[in-house]
Amino acid sequence: MRCPYCSYEESKVVDSRSAEDYNAIRRRRECLRCSKRYTTYEKVEDIPILVIKKDLSRESFNKEKIISGLIKACQKRPVSRAQIEEIAADIERNISNKMMVEIKSDYIGEMIMERLKDIDEVSYVRFASVYRQFKDINTFMEEIKSLMK
């Protein structure tokens, strides 16, 4: 690590501790030439996740899109913003833990529906109607009947 004061490349770590909810390490360093101290942060580099859409195009994973879809599905329902954000965070964590670099949008949609089904069935049906592109009332009824089993 190059000293920001004299550009010398040698330093020693004086103090080290977790920072940013344990997602980074904060280090206090001391330059071995000028003896000035400075702070550095060490963080694991995020691996970009690509979502494979239905038309086979790819786009970067965006947790905000999940949150936006959930907000629409849960509008005027007893589902809190915290619950919505927790679902999105759980899905992102699930994908990251599986070390997936590419994931089909269908898989994400199914994970969302699985979580919504346990929280609020009306929100689940709303989300499913858009996600599965229900064409008529019969498709709606089939989904509702499957919920009632």
Curated annotation (Swiss-Prot):
Keywords: ATP-binding, DNA-binding, Metal-binding, Nucleotide-binding, Repressor, Transcription, Transcription regulation, Zinc, Zinc-finger. It comes from the Bacteria. PROSITE patterns: ATP_CONE. GO terms for biological process: negative regulation of DNA-templated transcription. Residues 49-139 form the ATP-cone domain. Binds 1 zinc ion. Its cofactor is Zn(2+). It holds the Pfam family Zn_ribbon_NrdR. A zinc finger (unnamed) spans 3-34. InterPro entries: ATP-cone_dom (IPR005144), NrdR-like_N (IPR055173), RNR_NrdR-like (IPR003796). One of its GO terms (molecular function) is DNA binding. Negatively regulates transcription of bacterial ribonucleotide reductase nrd genes and operons by binding to NrdR-boxes. Belongs to the NrdR family. This is Transcriptional repressor NrdR. It comes from Clostridium perfringens (strain 13 / Type A). The gene is nrdR.
